[in-house]
Amino acid sequence: MGRYLDDFKIGEIFQAESFTLDEKQILEFALSYDPQPFHTDVAAAKDGPYGGLIGSGFQTLNLCFCRIVQSGVFDTVSMGGPGIEEVKFLMPVRPGDTIHTEAEILSIKPSRTKPDRGIMRVQYRGYNQQDNEVISFITIMLGKRNTTV
């Protein structure tokens, strides 16, 4: 059975399946969506500010978000979202890094004007295989309320 807005609790944390980024995935994403040399050119990246190729923070953000969505935890409640706030790329993600993601419910606010919905703020955090936090962001989710009870 799916969960509606009122079924979630502040402080609740959900885990998602981890993912590993390889060099090919990093290069393919960056060439299309974030074409900076430290994401697209292995040789140039060696002499760059990070001492080697690193993944785009936007790729990491997308994959962390995707893994939580794929977990199904928000399948019933989600009506999309009006925004993302406090995006922080905390550490580079390098080829071979395995990232695990968690999502924590920060706040739940039923709408005063539309009783079938509300807003839920969810903090996503991604950690590498050494358990170092590499990314953090907060989504603003428009969430369905169960109006049949």
Where do the PLM segments sit?
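HotDog/MaoC-like acyl-thioester-processing domains
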Residues: 3-10, 89, 93-149
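Hot-dog-fold acyl-thioester-processing enzymes
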Residues: 1-83, 146-149
